[in-house]
């Protein structure tokens, strides 16, 4: 699985003309792939959309011939984007919760 993910990502990055080191860890939770290099903003994309799309494609390639029970979760990250984004969303949720408590007005979902 690691080799399949590596080869696929290497080809995609080459087509995008992006120089990056690909580090892959096989954990109990699945494959954790970290891309390291300059100008990773192009890999992240707007609000992580490019990163999410690449993660989805890698997951499809890795799990192509697997059954439902053998599915391997794939997480693709760069520059610690995923944990930074999670922190940002938690801060936003807390701010909105404080506003609701303060104003006692219902908040519309986003």
Where are these regions (language model features)?
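RNA-contacting regions in translation and RNA-metabolism proteins
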Residues: 1-110
């Amino acid at each position: 699985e690691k080799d399949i993910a590596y080869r696929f990502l290497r080809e995609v990055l080459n087509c995008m003309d992006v120089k990056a080191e690909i580090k892959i860890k096989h954990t109990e939770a699945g494959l954790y792939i970290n891309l390291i290099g300059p100008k990773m903003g192009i890999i992240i994309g707007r609000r992580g959309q490019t990163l999410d799309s690449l993660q989805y494609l890698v997951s499809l390639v890795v799990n192509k011939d697997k059954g439902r029970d053998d599915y391997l979760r794939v997480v693709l990250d760069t520059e610690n984007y995923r944990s930074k984004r999670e922190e940002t969303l938690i801060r936003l949720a807390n701010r909105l919760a404080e506003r609701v408590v303060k104003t006692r007005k219902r908040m519309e979902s986003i």
